[in-house]
């Protein structure tokens, strides 16, 4: 119901969406059984008065609180693996990146890392967050591997919005070592101070992040896959470079 005044049973989720019609700014709420999520990614309800309303059923908006230590430098954000493994830590920073960009809807992003510990887990999280934030396509390195120069090449060659690189450079890896994440802009180069400051500013006030509830992508298989409405291309890590 539009007023959101519904009685919620334990197996019911509430979904909210804005009408797509330019003439209508109403927000709509709908209750959908969890069992329906397994069958559909989206459904539309035709309404002659207000147009078509699309509900993305498996996008979660997770409440969070800021961390005080997420100020990136030109080499991105580098911390101990155990810091990144804290609940919401990586997600907060990734959402801060997305919120700082000039529109993610319909954009393409490059993604990969140097293969250190936590690389694969982080990539799966970022893929699902990218899908939830409206990216249309992600080019991710085979097995999650993509060096900084190779990522820069992918960004320029395919004119992506930018790229996320998971690397802590010469810092040691392994569970007791370090992990890192940085954003490169559309020219393939590191994010300038204006961008990193915007990311940091957002990280200090963030209160929620979006993530798709979905199975992991098979990073070991080259090819094209769907993750919600987003296309994931698992590409050869060095061919274009």
Model-derived segments and spans:
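An N-terminal, well-structured beta->alpha segment
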Residues: 55-129, 229-241
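Ferredoxin-reductase
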Residues: 98, 104-190
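Extreme N-terminal basic, low-complexity initiation segments
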Residues: 2-13
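Short, positively charged and aromatic/hydrophobic N-terminal segments
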Residues: 42-45, 52-53
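Intrinsically disordered, low-complexity, charge-rich segments with an acidic bias
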Residues: 2-4, 19-33, 53
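Gly/Ser/Thr-enriched, mixed-charge loops and adjacent short helices
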Residues: 58-67, 80, 88, 177-241
């Amino acid at each position: 119901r539009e007023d959101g005044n519904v009685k919620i049973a334990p197996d019911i989720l509430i979904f909210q969406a804005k009408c797509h019609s330019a003439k209508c700014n109403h927000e709509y709420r709908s209750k959908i059984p969890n069992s329906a999520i397994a069958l559909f990614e989206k459904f539309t309800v035709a309404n002659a008065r207000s147009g078509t309303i699309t509900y993305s059923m498996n996008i979660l908006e997770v409440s969070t609180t800021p961390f005080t230590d997420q100020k990136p430098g030109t080499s991105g954000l580098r911390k101990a693996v155990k810091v990144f493994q804290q609940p919401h830590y990586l997600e907060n920073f990734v959402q801060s990146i997305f919120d700082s960009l000039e529109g993610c809807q319909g954009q393409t992003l490059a993604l990969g890392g140097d293969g250190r510990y936590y690389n694969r887990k982080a990539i799966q999280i970022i893929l699902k967050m990218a899908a939830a934030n409206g990216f249309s396509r992600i080019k991710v390195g085979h097995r999650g591997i993509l060096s900084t120069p190779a990522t820069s090449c992918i960004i320029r060659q395919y004119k992506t919005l930018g790229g996320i690189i998971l690397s802590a450079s010469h810092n040691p890896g392994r569970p007791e070592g370090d992990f890192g994440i940085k954003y490169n802009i559309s020219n393939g180069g590191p994010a300038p101070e204006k961008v990193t400051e915007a990311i940091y500013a957002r990280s200090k006030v963030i209160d929620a992040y979006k993530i798709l509830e979905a199975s992991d992508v098979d990073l070991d298989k080259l090819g094209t896959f769907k993750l919600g409405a987003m296309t994931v291309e698992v590409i050869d890590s060095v061919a274009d470079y």
